[in-house]
């Protein structure tokens, strides 16, 4: 693997430590990427341990060949949103000792201009996590209504100028279709008046399109629900998020499953019944990378790790 596309796993020790790995346990790395977290998990497993990795990126599946000779490891080509389905097919529901999710786009995906994720590198406007299927960002931009684009930019990118940007994209695509990342990034930079300090004007729009194209938030929601339902009693989940939308989802999910389902005041429901709906115990506070890690890997700056443990059934 070239140095250009090398990937430094974020919060590596903290994330794997959060799983409290047992030598004979069964674990899931739902976001294999280039295998950094998987390698660390395998180093903690004994000969009877097992690691099931998942990724929908064909390049990640190719990278997984590095573990082809390790009988403890297997890779599944698919989205982590279907995690529970894969576990059910293997007959392992309720037997998983830990689930690891490193959300968002990986460094190799960002650094490879041909994947179309980066506004800093000119390449085809693609953005698909699985570039073997589904519509590209260019195809969506060519067809999307102004209102739909504005909604995506605001909802998934928290972009304040969403409507203005959507209108400008619609006007420009009538003359020339947006086929390259540079074309879209340059337009947004040109029409943005109040630029954020130390942030490219296209950051939020590119994030929004990527999340929408890949149904990322839906995948996260399905993965979290799936993980809590396949974990063994006292099994752990270590979840790394990189932006406020992701972290908000993870935080709310863990809070809901650790506090139990909320019920309207006055209903004749006992404390014991509420406790039955509690599935998780959150462990410690959210963790951020150290200053040293951020110096070594600036992309780790916004990462947040949350860990929870499955309660007894």
Curated annotation (Swiss-Prot):
Keyword Transferase: yes
MF annotations from Gene Ontology: rRNA (cytosine-N4-)-methyltransferase activity
E.C. number(s) listed in UniProt: 2.1.1.199
Gene Ontology terms: biological process: rRNA base methylation
GO cellular-component term (any): cytoplasm
Binding residues for S-adenosyl-L-methionine: 35-37, 55, 80, 102, 109
Localization in the cell: Cytoplasm
NCBIfam families reported for this sequence: 16S rRNA (cytosine(1402)-N(4))-methyltransferase RsmH
Protein name according to UniProt: Ribosomal RNA small subunit methyltransferase H
Source organism: Shewanella denitrificans (strain OS217 / ATCC BAA-1090 / DSM 15013)
């Amino acid at each position: 693997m070239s140095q250009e596309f090398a990937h430094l796993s974020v919060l590596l020790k903290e994330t794997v430590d959060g799983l409290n790995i047992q030598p004979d346990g069964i674990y899931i790395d739902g976001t294999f990427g280039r295998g950094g977290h998987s390698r660390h998990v395998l180093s903690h497993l004994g000969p009877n341990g097992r690691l099931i990795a998942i990724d929908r990126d064909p390049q990640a599946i190719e990278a997984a060949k590095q573990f082809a000779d390790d009988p403890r490891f297997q890779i599944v080509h698919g989205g982590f949103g279907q995690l529970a389905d894969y576990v059910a097919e293997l007959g392992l529901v309720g037997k998983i000792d830990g689930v690891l999710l490193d959300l968002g786009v990986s460094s190799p995906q960002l650094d490879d201009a041909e994947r179309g994720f980066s506004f800093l590198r000119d390449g085809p406007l693609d953005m698909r996590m699985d570039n073997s299927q589904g519509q590209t960002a260019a195809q969506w931009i060519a067809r999307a209504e102004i209102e739909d684009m504005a909604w995506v930019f605001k909802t998934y990118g928290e972009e304040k100028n969403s409507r203005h940007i959507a209108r400008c994209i619609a006007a420009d695509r009538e003359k020339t279709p947006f086929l390259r990342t540079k074309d879209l990034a340059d337009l947004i930079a040109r029409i943005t008046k109040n630029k954020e300090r130390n942030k490219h004007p296209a950051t939020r729009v590119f994030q929004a399109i990527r999340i929408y194209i890949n149904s990322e938030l839906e995948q996260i929601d399905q993965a979290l629900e799936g993980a809590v339902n396949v974990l063994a009693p006292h099994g752990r989940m270590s979840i790394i998020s990189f932006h406020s939308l992701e972290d908000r989802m993870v935080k709310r999910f863990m809070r809901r499953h650790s506090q139990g389902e909320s019920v309207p005041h006055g209903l004749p429901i006992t404390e014991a019944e509420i406790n039955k709906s509690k599935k998780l115990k959150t462990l410690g506070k959210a963790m951020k990378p150290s200053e040293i890690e951020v110096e070594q890997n600036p992309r780790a700056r916004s990462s947040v790790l949350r860990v929870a443990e499955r309660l007894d059934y």
